[in-house]
Curated annotation (Swiss-Prot):
Lineage start: Archaea, Methanobacteriati, Methanobacteriota, Methanomada group, Methanobacteria
Family to which this protein belongs: Belongs to the universal ribosomal protein uL5 family.
Keywords for this protein: Ribonucleoprotein, Ribosomal protein, RNA-binding, rRNA-binding, tRNA-binding
Quaternary assembly: Part of the 50S ribosomal subunit; contacts the 5S rRNA and probably tRNA. Forms a bridge to the 30S subunit in the 70S ribosome.
Entry-linked NCBIfam families: PRK04219.1
Signal peptide: none
Protein name as it appears in the record: Large ribosomal subunit protein uL5
GO MF term list: rRNA binding; structural constituent of ribosome; tRNA binding
């Protein structure tokens, strides 16, 4: 196979949406730091929503972006939390994968800590092929050609080969 056509992981993003600022958000930040040995960033609300008690630019969630070897280890770890079962509908047309974990204690090695509590999280994995830099660079920025874009099937095969995932239909 041509090495320029090999699918690789660009990044893995893990986020916890708390919905409020304060103690609960700081506990979610502590949890992500403990799980991935990296400091997460806070994300802020974009609009005011009085029904939920949210004001504009109020911190309501935290997220973490992992790249390289850290991303591979993190994906392997969180896939164990869902027993490596993925639905084909969790892949989008560009070949990205997104799934949720209901409780972080489902992940092997994670223990319940009463000081932190239980949090669910969203995991998004972005894939790319070598040469995707042309779309991100500053000078002479171009689109990735259609024949070089990643399809859903390519990503599904990559996950099956490298992470031994099972595809469930439900």
């Amino acid at each position: 196979m041509n090495p320029m056509n090999e699918v690789q992981i660009s990044k893995a993003t893990v986020s916890i949406g708390v919905g409020e600022a304060g103690e609960k958000l700081s506990r979610a930040i502590t949890l992500l730091e403990q799980m991935f040995d990296q400091t997460p960033v806070k994300t802020f609300s974009k609009v005011t929503n009085p029904e939920f008690g949210i004001r504009k630019r109020q911190p309501i969630a935290c997220k973490l972006t992992l790249r390289g070897e850290k991303a591979d280890k993190a994906i392997e770890m969180v896939l164990e939390g869902i027993n490596k079962n993925i639905k084909p509908t969790q892949f989008d047309a560009q070949g990205n994968l997104s799934f949720g974990i209901k409780e972080h204690i489902d992940i092997p090695g994670m223990k319940y800590n009463p000081d932190i509590g239980i949090f669910g999280m969203n995991v998004s994995v972005t894939f790319e092929k070598p040469g995707y830099r042309i779309a991100k660079r500053r000078i002479q920025q171009k689109k990735v050609p259609a024949k070089h874009r990643i399809s859903k099937e390519e990503t599904m095969k990559y996950m099956e080969d490298n992470f031994n995932v099972n595809y469930v239909t439900e």
